């Protein structure tokens, strides 16, 4: 299995009773995201309904700032995240409400994948790992290939690109002599 992380944006809704509801919207399925990853429909498997919401991918219990339900929504063809922030982090709660924190990072282990003709990583199956509130907002122009794919997948992708380029060179040379 290989670890992947992706970003999602956060929406804050004020309920009639004055409480806040939070929802994160993940990458669309079937579209290459800014990390060069394509998720196939409903490819991420979940071992349980709710997961701890971490702060900046922290592993310690002090970094648990809430809990979240992540799920595939067929109607929108996206992974959605409904989450609650605990009272132990009032500054983080306020920062989310004010828009200072507007990104989630979703991590999962891919168990079945391939690279398509554009060298994008196509995820066919994955096991959900964790979700974190992160300080870096979603940026459509950002490329996080090294962090998103990890070293092992980046090397594999580079080898595929090199092989395709070498094959193209051979085909070009062959055409010259035909």
Curated annotation (Swiss-Prot):
Coiled-coil portions: 146-178
Class of this enzyme: hydrolase
GO MF assignments: peptidase activity
Superkingdom of origin: Viruses
Keyword terms, alphabetized: Coiled coil, Hydrolase, Protease, Viral capsid assembly, Viral capsid maturation, Viral release from host cell
DNA damage keyword on record: no
One of the protein's GO biological processes: viral procapsid maturation
Job description of the protein: Probable capsid maturation protease.
Protein name according to UniProt: Probable capsid maturation protease
């Amino acid at each position: 299995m290989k670890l992947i992380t992706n970003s999602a944006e956060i929406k804050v809704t004020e309920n009639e009773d004055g409480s806040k509801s939070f929802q994160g919207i993940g990458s669309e399925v079937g579209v290459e995201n800014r990390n060069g990853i394509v998720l196939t429909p409903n490819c991420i498997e979940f071992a349980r309904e709710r997961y701890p919401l971490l702060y900046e991918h922290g592993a310690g219990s002090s970094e648990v700032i809430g809990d979240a339900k992540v799920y595939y929504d067929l109607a929108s063809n996206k992974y959605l995240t409904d989450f609650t922030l605990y009272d132990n982090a009032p500054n983080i709660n306020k920062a989310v409400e004010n828009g200072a924190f507007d990104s989630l990072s979703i991590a999962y282990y891919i168990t079945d994948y391939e690279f398509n003709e554009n060298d994008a990583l196509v995820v066919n199956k994955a096991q959900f790992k964790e979700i974190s509130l992160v300080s870096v907002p979603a940026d459509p122009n950002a490329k996080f290939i090294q962090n998103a794919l990890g070293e092992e997948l980046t090397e594999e992708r580079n080898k595929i690109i090199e092989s395709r380029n070498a094959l193209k060179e051979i085909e070009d040379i062959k055409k010259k002599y035909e």
